[in-house]
Amino acid sequence: MDPIVRMESITKRFGALTANEGIDFTLNQGETHALVGENGAGKTTLMRILYGQYAPDGGRIFIDGEQCAYGVAGALKRGIGMVHQNFMQIDRMSITENIILGHAPAAAGFVDYRAARAKIRALLTRFGMQKVSPDAPIDSLCVGERQKIEIIKALYLGARERLLDLLSNYCG
């Protein structure tokens, strides 16, 4: 059986700085991995490559045995979601709006907001946030709750595999 994710000889440079060089990584079904290292060691860069935010300068990525093209849309389509260390949220928007922004499936160009809201309410309940309205402004939440919203966003988008970037920064 093929690994869920296989990265081969991944290299990424930013000008003269080499962030990742020749990195090999394999993730099999049921495994959990942690990338541990000093600030600036290239952990976030490697995750952003897997998520499709950065294209590597060298190497290949396979998901479920198929070589991937790079890009966030491709990663989401293949079930890879990322929870960023810096929130990807717009303060003046609601929880639901922040989660579906740019990602909600649309029929005939329209978002089924009611269905999206119901799915988000179920995810809020799953994360112990049943008292929080999906219509609440995102900036009314504390930092830990906002981090949970980032995880909920990845699950809402159908992420099978989740990349958590410095999640412990917000967990107290």
What are these regions (language model features)?
Residues 1-172:
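Glycine-rich phosphate-binding loops of nucleotide-dependent enzymes
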